Structures are given as C-alpha cells and as structure tokens.
Swiss-Prot record:
It catalyses: RNA(n) + ATP = RNA(n)-3'-adenine ribonucleotide + diphosphate. This is Poly(A) RNA polymerase protein 1. SUPFAM superfamilies: Nucleotidyltransferase, PAP/OAS1 substrate-binding domain. The modification Phosphoserine is found at S596, S602. The keyword Transmembrane helix does not apply. The gene is TRF5. It holds the Pfam family PAP_assoc. Its cofactor is Mg(2+); Mn(2+). The keyword Glycosyltransferase does not apply. ATP binds at G298, K323, N428, R432. Present with 2240 molecules/cell in log phase SD medium.
Amino acid sequence: MTRLKAKYSPTKGKRKEDKHTKRMRKSSFTRTQKMLEVFNDNRSHFNKYESLAIDVEDDDTFGNLVLMENDKSDVDIPVIEEVTSSEDEQRAESSKRNNSLEDNQDFIAFSDSSEDETEQIKEDDDERSSFLLTDEHEVSKLTSQQSLNTESACNVEYPWIRNHCHSKQRRIADWLTSEIKDFVHYISPSKNEIKCRNRTIDKLRRAVKELWSDADLHVFGSFATDLYLPGSDIDCVVNSRNRDKEDRNYIYELARHLKNKGLAIRMEVIVKTRVPIIKFIEPQSQLHIDVSFERTNGLEAAKLIREWLRDSPGLRELVLIIKQFLHSRRLNNVHTGGLGGFTVICLVYSFLNMHPRIKSNDIDVLDNLGVLLIDFFELYGKNFGYDDVAISISDGYASYIPKSCWRTLEPSRSKFSLAIQDPGDPNNNISRGSFNMKDIKKAFAGAFELLVNKCWELNSATFKDRVGKSILGNVIKYRGQKRDFNDERDLVQNKAIIENERYHKRRTRIVQEDLFINDTEDLPVEEIYKLDEPAKKKQKAKKDKREGEIKKSAIPSPPPDFGVSRSKLKRKVKKTDQGSLLHQNNLSIDDLMGLSENDQESDQDQKGRDTPSGQDEKSPLETKTVDAQTRRDYWLSKGQAL
C-alpha cells in the first residue's frame, strides 16, 4: 500500500514525467545526429579516379572511327575524321583544368548555344503572329458567335425577349407594353398542345360514357376560356340525368374504372370536402386532371368569362401575366390560401371596368398594358381596403360595396380578407378560400416597387446599357421548356369551347332543384325546351266546380207554358230562390269548416227524409240567433256523418 501511494504521489509522478521527457529528447537528438553524420562522411564522396593521368591525345584518338575488314597488314585502313568545333575544344580544355564534380558544379546544360534559344523564340513569335493574323471572315465569324453566346446567356432567365429587343424604345412604358405582348405570345398554346388536350378530353369522355350511359363529361375553367398557362391542369365535371353521381360509391367506381383503363396515374380521391373531386395525371400527355361531380356553376362561369373577353380588350394579357406572377411565387393554389383562376379574372375585370381613364376613353388598353399592369399592382398592393370593401359584379358591371351591406357574406377567418360576389350567385363569395391575403398583398406591393424602380433605372441608362435588359423579368419568372413565339389558337379548334357552347344551346335554365334536363342526348331543341303543363290542384278544381254551380243557379229559368197558372209559377220561383240562398249559405259554412260536398249532400238527404212532406222547409236565414244547443247538435250530426 505504501508503494502504491508513493507511486501515485504528485512528486513521483512529476519526476517520472520529467525522466520520460529527457529520454525522448535524447533519442531524438541521437537520431538526428546520425542523420547529419552522413554529410560529414568523406568516404561517400571519395574520387576514385583522382590519381589517373589524363592523356591529351585521347581526344584525337577517341574522335576517329576505325573500320577493320581483315587482319591483313597490306590492306589500307580507312580513317574517318570527325571535325570538332572550337567551343567543344574549349570545353574539353576547361574540363581538363578543373574538376567540376569536385567543385560541385556538375550541372547539365539544356542548350549548347544561345543561337538555338533565339531561333526557338523566333519560331514562337511566328506561330503567335500566324495565329493572330487570321482571315477577316473568321474574325467576324468568331465575333458573331461570341455575341450570340452573350445574348443566349442574357436570355436564359428571360426567354420571351429572344430576338425581340425593345431597348431602343424611347418611352419606357412602350417597352414594358411590348414585352408583355411578347410574353403572351411566348406562352400561348401551339397547335400540338391544343391537339394533345383535345385527345385527352375525348378519351376521358368515352370512358365516362362507357361506365354510365346517362352521364357526360364537360370541361370548364381555364381550358374552356383560353386562359391557361403551359402545363396547367384541366377542370372537368360529370353531370348525369338523375344527378346522383356525387355519391361516394359512384366516385370510387369512376376512379377504379379510369385506373383500370390506364387513363390515370397518381390518383387522389377527395370525398370529405364540400365539393368531392378526383385528382390524377393522364399518363400519355402528363396533364393534371381534376374531375368534380354534378356541378353547373363552372360551365356557366366559362360562358360568362368568354363574354368578358370579347367585350374587354387587354383582359387576356393581364390575366396571363398575373397568373404567371402568382404561379412563380406559389400563390395560385386555393388550398394553401392563394388566389384561384376565377378570382384573378374577376380582379382584373373589375379593375379594367372601373379604371377612370378607360371609362372616359382617354387611353387605349392594348397600347398601355405596361401602365395598367403597374396600376393593378399599386391598387391591390397598396390602396385597396381589404377590411371594409367588397367587389360586386352584376350584369357585366363592376362596383365596390361595403362589407357591412353584404348581409349574406359568410364570416371569414380574419377581417383582412378579399370578398368578391359571384356573378352567378350574389350570396356566394368566390374568394372565401383565399386566406393568405397578407402575403398576396405584399407580393403585389413588391412587384409595384420593382417595376417602378426598374423603369427609372432604364430611363436614365444609355441605349448601349439597355441591351439584353428586361423590365418584366423583375416580376415574372419562367423556367419551363423553350417555346416558340407561335400563337396557333386560330389553326386548331378548342373542343372544350365548342362543347361548352353546344351545352348552353341545348340547356335551359334550371328553375326547380328537382328538374334536370338531360342534355347529353342528341334531341331537337324544340323537344328539350318543351315542358309538360303541371296538373291542377284538387282545391282549385273544386273551387272551379262550385263557381260553375253558382253561375248556373244565377241563370233565370226558361219561360213557363201558357197552361200553367200564375200562382203556381210564383210558388215555383220562390222555391228556386230559397234553394239558391240555402245553397250559398251552406257553401260558405263548408268552406270555413273544410267539409266536403259528399257530406253536405248526405246531410241534406237525411233532413229531407226526416221532414214531413206537407211542411215547407225553413231557411236558416230566417233564424236570427242560434243557441248553444243548436250548434252542439249541428256539429254532433256532422261528426256522425263523417
């Protein structure tokens, strides 16, 4: 125990540590000393040939090449002498005088003379000059290639300005307007894209008809209005004669049918929402498809939007710009609080419809798209009162209304929200799902600042500094595949628009919820619009019958025969008048009590049998007061008759 304590005492440990350190230093020093002794060893540098004598004649002998054909002494031996240069002789003499190896001057020269170096330098200069002095055609070709590369590098982020340079525009607003038109032409659908979408819709429609013969598939949304971006989805709706396809079982049945037919991949069925929907991708065209059920408001909205496009120039251009702006910032999805397509269209339409300079015909819309785009961002990014103001569009006219006056407005998540009345249903707020309005307003305000600052910057720049610049590129980003500037909508018919117009020609406006006209059958228009007259109600038929009886009783009786005495005639007329008065009184009582005519007739027959034949019937009008017992007996008899 004592040794252990001494071993682990601080002093012992310190002494042991110092001893170990000294040993390491000594060993390292010894190893280093042995390595340095190599340089002090003269034996490794001993010159073994120092004692040998150098013969001067060896140079001449060594320089001669002797060829011996045979050993005969009488044969002359030819000798070929190699002439050495003066520099070689001088080098040999210097080597004889000095031992370069001993003097540590045994370096190897890379060239024999400076003439070779000068010749090499001249050759390099000739090659460099020959490379620089190329043909003028090749120089211009290289310059043009470099300029094309520079232009392509500048147009990577702004492909719509390729071969469309507007930097020489004197007015910056005209530059922005031209750039907006170029962008719209750049993203407009080509002939192949329209054909691809038409084929996809035809395949889906045949599949729905194959599953349900009484149903049909219709297209609404951006594809039915020509307001879709490249690669945007297609909105469809399935309507049937019985209007029962919104049931969950039918939805899953259609989903299985499309998947078995190979028309859908990455399918998602959403049934626990207000509007059930099927989302999938068509594998051949890679287009996103959304299918809803038993809805007609989208088809009505598509027709209304096409009317707006015909009446409002510049609406399509601004809508496509705003859609791309929101798409690049991921603010176009309603499920995440963004703005939907119909909401954007209503915003732009109300903006153009209420712009003071447009209403006064002060400016042309198509020539001032740049200014209008900046005004749009300023209005909805800085000046619009989202807390108190709503937008109303009725009969093609837009207006602002206070939210307090919209009594049927559903309460939103926050007071700061966008409210737009549905043009087809004034009680519906089409923008109630856009709950992320704060970020959308910030995006609009930021776009306004970017456009204004860029316009000021390029307005003060020279034409040389404007080359390759873009104003719209500060707020619009397009990262899709390269496209051509071909707007080929006039070359191919859009079947979605044709089917929508045909649908509205066949369809009548639905008045009752339980009335649905099957517009899928190819019937004449006259038969579709022909409605059966509804059957008359029973009460109305009874009332008409009673009125006819009263009119008959009011008609005077035919003239009597001359053989009848006057007294009998008076008596007969008196009875007729009394019977008509009694009948009128009974009608009023029956109408008040709700008794039928059969009960009345049976009651009268019973009274007729009880009354003696010789007595005259007394009219109820002669009784001025009716006591309680009489009323009790009357109602008791009515109850027994029933």
